[in-house]
């Protein structure tokens, strides 16, 4: 069978707020084109993606989404005409400019890099949804603002790294070079993708990619405390890891939390305030919210205790 005769299918789920990020992340790993929209009448989200029919990984990705979200969504499949689909898809995802410093582009785009920006190149199948997704954009904007604040970060970790885009952005932007970044994900295929993208972006020597469920792996704990932590996952897992994350954060350090909807901000923020972290900035991106939290330096803590 020729490449142009590949059979394609569109897969779709309809889920509530709390399951959106888990299912969208699952689709991103196995589909070339992922989109989502909110049905204002029902309050439910429609998530769909296009993939080669019969390729592996979908069932495993959906099982993980069900486990993470607690929502068992029905999968809806329809045939998709293959002719011209790839070209149409590429046209739908041009270079994404994020903030003042970043440009995200798929490997299907040619031409010189955008002047004055750090270009992050991702394989086309992975790039879809990365630069344009509200959570990813929010994290990149947060990183840009922290660096503009002249915060030097030496020990960085990206939890739930996915494509590795945030780890690569930190490796490219943070001074002094070269900063080492730990990039961890619960899924082996995400870690492999991050490794491949690190090579593509010439930062493989700065990224340490490994499979880990949160803070469980010894190499992650051994490198703590971190002065910058990315956690772009889900609202409830973010709440669940508030204690170990706060314990692994250097006094004076920052954490960038994402993967939560604006409606979940209060719940997540409360969990981290109980661990002594304070809100530095909230960055809304559509329905999504990114939080920058700060751990007070030791001197500030001692001053607060003595004044009490």
Each language-model region and where it sits:
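Conserved hydrophobic residues forming the short capping helix/wall of the S-adenosyl-L-methionine
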Residues: 65-66, 198, 272
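SAM-dependent Rossmann-like transferase core, predominantly class I methyltransferases
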Residues: 84-150
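Conserved SAM/SAH cofactor-binding pocket of Class I
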Residues: 126, 130-218, 225
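Short alpha-helix immediately C-terminal to the canonical SAM-binding loop
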Residues: 191-192, 238, 265
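Hydrophobic beta-strand segment of the Class I
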Residues: 229-230
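A short glycine-rich, Lys/Arg-flanked "PGG" loop and its adjoining helix->strand segment in the class I
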Residues: 239-254
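Active-site capping/gating segments
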Residues: 260-308
């Amino acid at each position: 069978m020729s490449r142009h005769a590949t059979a394609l299918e569109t897969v779709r789920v309809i889920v509530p707020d709390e399951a959106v990020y888990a299912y969208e992340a699952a689709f991103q790993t196995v589909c070339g084109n992922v989109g989502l929209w909110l049905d204002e009448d029902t309050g439910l989200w429609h998530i769909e993606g296009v993939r080669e029919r019969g390729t592996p990984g979908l069932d495993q990705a959906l099982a993980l989404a069900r486990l993470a979200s607690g929502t068992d969504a029905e999968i809806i499949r329809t045939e998709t005409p293959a002719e011209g689909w790839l070209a149409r898809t590429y046209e739908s995802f041009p270079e994404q400019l994020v903030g003042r410093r970043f440009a995200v582009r798929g490997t299907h785009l040619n031409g010189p890099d955008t002047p004055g920006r750090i270009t992050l190149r991702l394989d086309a199948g992975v790039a879809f949804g990365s630069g344009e997704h509200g959570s990813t954009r929010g994290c990149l904007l947060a990183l840009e603002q922290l660096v503009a604040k002249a915060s030097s970060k030496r020990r960085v970790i990206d939890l739930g790294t996915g494509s590795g885009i945030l780890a690569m952005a930190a490796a490219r932007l943070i001074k002094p070079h070269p900063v080492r970044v730990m990039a961890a994900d619960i899924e082996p295929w995400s870690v492999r993708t991050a490794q491949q993208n690190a090579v593509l972006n010439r930062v493989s020597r700065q990224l340490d990619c490994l499979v880990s469920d949160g803070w469980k792996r010894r190499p992650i704990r051994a490198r703590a405390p971190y002065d910058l932590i990315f956690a772009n996952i889900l609202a409830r897992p973010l709440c669940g890891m508030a204690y170990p994350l706060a314990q692994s954060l250097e006094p004076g350090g920052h954490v960038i939390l994402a993967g939560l909807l604006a409606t979940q901000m209060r719940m997540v923020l409360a969990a981290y305030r109980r661990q002594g972290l304070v809100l530095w900035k909230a960055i809304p991106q559509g329905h999504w919210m990114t939080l920058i939290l700060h751990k007070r330096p030791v001197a500030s803590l001692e001053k607060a205790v003595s004044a009490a």
